[in-house]
Regions:
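PLD/PLD-like phosphodiesterase catalytic module centered on the HKD motif
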Residues: 1-158
């Protein structure tokens, strides 16, 4: 397909279309040795766009907690290749104390066989409908609430 055909199709599509995101004037790049997500990410404001490289001193659950402080109760999707018991425990606490209104996990098809205990815990704690099993190595976090929609791309598992 030629560029002209693609451009024409995009022009005729209904609603907003985004092919390439222009650099945000609010984008911050950080290399952090700070020990927590809150101080590394900083204040949450509309239009925030932060790229943070860390030394592994905090995890995805810490990022989730900081973002949930900004949103208040929110709907959450976690895509992970594997999950640790401590992070599953934290997600359960966030759900019980209503920081998370709904929670869905997307996990790799190998997870049930690789980590049957953790997989069964996911299903038992959060419900069968809360776990999607597919071929995936993606790691991301989606949070929507309080007028915010966050997308967190990460190399870290939950």
């Amino acid at each position: 397909m030629t560029k002209a055909k693609v451009d024409n199709q995009l022009k005729n599509m209904p609603g907003p279309v985004s092919i390439k995101k222009n650099q945000s004037p609010w984008r911050e790049y950080k290399l952090s040795r700070i020990a927590n997500a809150k101080d590394t990410i900083g204040e949450i404001t509309p239009g925030i766009d932060v790229y943070a490289l860390t030394m592994g001193q905090f995890d995805l659950a810490d990022v989730m907690e900081h973002l949930l402080e900004a949103t208040g109760p929110a709907d959450v999707v976690v895509a992970t290749w594997t999950a640790a018991k401590a992070d599953l425990d934290r997600a359960e606490v966030f759900l019980k104390d209503k920081r998370i209104l709904s929670l869905r996990f997307i996990v790799d098809q190998s997870f049930p066989n690789r980590q049957p205990g953790y997989f069964n815990r996911l299903v038992n704690k959060f419900g069968e409908g809360s776990v999607v099993v597919t071929r995936s190595h993606c790691k991301f976090l989606l949070i929507k609430g309080g007028g915010y929609s966050f997308i967190v791309r990460t190399s870290a598992n939950l």
